[in-house]
């Protein structure tokens, strides 16, 4: 039986905002994201959004190229997510879609400091919650930050939109043409087989809180379709029958 969905967290790659490997935020891609968030919200779904910063800067890559320490590199990556979040927030406001921009780092001139209580209030009020700066600590990925937010906000499902693959595979399909895609994989099998796409800490957090994850290609499908169509991407869960349905 389909589970009635009330609250969802979307994890979006920063690359979804840029075009042709550019670090420039693309107007059309930003407009598409806003349009798709509106479509999901029109189903009476509460939305939290965690956005990456890889289109602007990747912490580990910058650490190697610029010879800066890991902590500084990761903090630079966190700030990149804030830049993307500011762009999304302004684009939503321009369309009269209420939102709250939050940061785990204190920067009151730019965003509200993230707290679960304030964030849940915003969701209850119908605002789209934008969570930036990842987990707020170095050495932790934005995927882990998204999983933390999903647990704190008690979401019904975490949807990860990727730009490179259309689900979870037994090995990297970009390197191995014979890679096999999973329609469903349990949390434990994901961890024991060391599958890619999301890091183990993010999977473990969702497993402990019984939050299903759907991984799909943002290049191929919409957020709304990924949320409600069980044939899209890969479901990572303890229950193969977990299907989301709109609220009525």
Swiss-Prot record:
The lineage of its organism: Bacteria, Pseudomonadati, Chlamydiota, Chlamydiia, Chlamydiales. The keyword Cytoplasm applies. ATP binds at residues 11-14, 54, 58, 162, 169, 172. Its EC number is 2.7.4.22. Inhibited by UTP. GO terms for cellular component: cytoplasm. This is Uridylate kinase. It is found in: Cytoplasm. Keywords: ATP-binding, Cytoplasm, Kinase, Nucleotide-binding, Pyrimidine biosynthesis, Transferase. It catalyses: UMP + ATP = UDP + ADP. GO terms for molecular function: ATP binding; UMP kinase activity.
């Amino acid at each position: 039986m389909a589970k009635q969905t009330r609250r969802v967290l979307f994890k979006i790659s920063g690359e979804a905002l840029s075009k042709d490997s550019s670090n420039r935020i693309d107007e059309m891609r930003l407009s598409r994201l806003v349009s798709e968030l509106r479509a999901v919200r029109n189903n009476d779904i509460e939305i939290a959004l965690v956005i990456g910063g890889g289109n602007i800067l990747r912490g580990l890559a910058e650490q190697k190229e610029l010879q800066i320490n890991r902590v500084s590199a990761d903090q630079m990556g966190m700030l990149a997510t804030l830049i993307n979040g500011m762009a999304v927030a302004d684009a939503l406001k321009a369309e009269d879609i209420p939102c709250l921009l939050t940061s785990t780092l204190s920067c009151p001139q730019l965003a509200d400091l993230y707290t679960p209580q304030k964030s849940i209030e915003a969701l209850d009020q119908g605002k789209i919650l934008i969570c930036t700066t990842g987990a707020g600590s170095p050495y932790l990925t934005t995927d882990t930050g998204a999983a933390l937010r999903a647990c704190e906000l008690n979401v019904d499902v975490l949807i990860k939109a990727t730009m490179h693959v259309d689900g979870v595979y037994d090995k990297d399909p970009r390197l191995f043409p014979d890679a096999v895609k999973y329609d469903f994989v349990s949390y434990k099998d994901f961890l024991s087989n060391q599958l890619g796409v999301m890091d183990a800490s993010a999977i473990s957090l969702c497993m402990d809180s019984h939050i299903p994850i759907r991984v799909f290609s943002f290049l191929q499908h919409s957020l709304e379709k990924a949320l409600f169509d069980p044939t899209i991407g890969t479901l990572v869960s303890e229950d193969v029958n977990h299907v989301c349905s709109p609220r009525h």
